A protein has these predicted regions:
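Short, conserved, GDST-rich strand-edge loop motifs in beta-rich repeat architectures
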Residues: 25-58, 146, 169-171, 182-219
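Repeated scaffold domains used in trafficking and secretory/extracellular systems
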Residues: 6-14, 80-92, 120-127, 168-171, ...
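Short loop/turn segments that connect beta-strands within beta-propeller blades
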Residues: 67-71, 106-110, 149-153, 244-248, ...
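Structural signal for beta-propeller blades
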Residues: 63, 103-105, 143-146, 238-241, ...
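Surface-exposed loop and turn segments in beta-propeller and other repeat-based domains
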Residues: 77-78, 156-215, 287-307
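Short coil/turn segments that connect the beta-strands within blades of beta-propeller domains
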Residues: 19-22, 92-94, 130-134, 225-229, ...
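Conserved beta-strand positions in repeat-built beta-propeller and related beta-rich domains
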Residues: 25-41, 46-49, 55-57, 96-100, ...
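Blade-loop segments of beta-propeller domains
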Residues: 70-127
């Protein structure tokens, strides 16, 4: 593996090369203190996995808009408050955003709600930009991906990690493998083999905390090069995968990331992802990588100590 490291603290600060930027963002929770306390509490789990170990009360967050000009925030406004919004995407007259286990679609001055019993902890939404007829949804709570038509709001595609080679998480208390399934016959097989398992038979009533998930797919986007593929980010494994929609097979595109978010394909055989707890943005593939490190930049609050958390990356054209 060839790695080229870049410390952003050594870069020159220049805010003159880009125009005014308008952003639409999600704020998962306004209670940042509670998030920090959960992180510290769960830091020493035996499974060594980042994330909550039990279902918690849903927090209130919001959708906000920001304007950045010459390196300064010149406008900020919370547009609405709702339960834990994470995913948001907007293109031309279409806007879609998520709230925990549902998707809201705004199109031509109308709003439609899309639900699915397997929607849980939705993290991202990606509108297909060329024809504007489809969107992808990452249902992180059940390690799954969905595609819906924008016009009819019909499900067009689904993919579950458990049924495509990623069939177990870890018990956060013991560190043992915990096999996951929504299939009754598979659950019976695990029972007969004496394996520890969790059978999700009623997704509306059952939940799967972050630390127990097999993949924790926290983003999925369309492949701009190959329409047969989608690009998904696996938080626990630290990998960006390229998933073939026809076969269900997942091929590793970018690895070695720490609790990543926001995987994407930049061009043929070149990908990008945010190595969140590594404090880096990484581009490249499985053979060669370029890393942009945020660790030494000024402005981090003292209580974070040596913790890094770079949540996501967007390409501004």
């Amino acid at each position: 593996m060839v790695v080229n490291n870049n410390d952003l603290a050594t870069f020159k600060i220049d805010n003159s090369f880009y125009p005014e930027i308008k952003l639409l963002i999600t704020i998962k929770s306004f209670d940042l203190q509670a998030i920090r306390e959960r992180y510290l509490k769960n830091k020493n789990k035996k499974s060594n996995r980042t994330g909550s170990v039990a279902r918690r009360e849903i927090a209130t967050g919001g959708i906000a808009e920001l304007t950045i000009k010459n390196g300064e925030i010149t406008h900020s406004e919370v547009l609405t408050e709702l339960p834990e919004p994470r995913g948001v995407d907007s293109f031309d007259e279409i806007t879609a955003f998520s709230s925990e286990n549902r998707v809201y679609l705004l199109n031509n001055n109308s709003i439609t709600t899309i639900t699915n019993p397997w929607f849980s902890y939705i993290h991202t939404i990606d509108i297909e930009k060329s024809q504007k007829k489809r969107m992808l949804v990452s249902s992180s709570g059940f390690d799954s991906i969905f595609e819906y038509s924008l016009e009819e709001q019909k499900k067009m595609f689904e993919w579950f990690a458990w049924e495509n080679g990623f069939d177990h998480g870890l018990d956060p208390e013991s560190g043992e493998k915990l096999f996951l399934t929504r299939n009754e016959e598979k659950a019976a097989q695990y029972e007969a083999e004496g394996k520890k398992y969790l059978f999700i038979s009623d997704p509306a009533a059952q939940t799967l905390p972050t630390a127990k998930r097999a993949a924790f797919i926290n983003s999925v986007v369309y492949d701009p090069v190959d329409k047969n593929n989608v690009i998904a980010t696996f938080f626990h494994e630290g990998t960006v995968y390229e998933i073939d929609r026809n076969t269900g097979q997942a091929g590793k595109a970018l690895g070695g990331l720490k609790n990543p978010h926001g995987g994407m394909k930049l061009e043929f055989n070149r990908y990008a992802g945010t190595s969140t707890t590594g404090g880096e943005i990484i581009t490249g593939n499985t053979y060669s990588q370029t890393c942009y490190n945020f660790e030494n930049l000024k402005g981090k609050q003292d209580f974070l100590i040596d913790m890094q958390w770079v949540q996501n990356t967007k390409i501004i054209e």
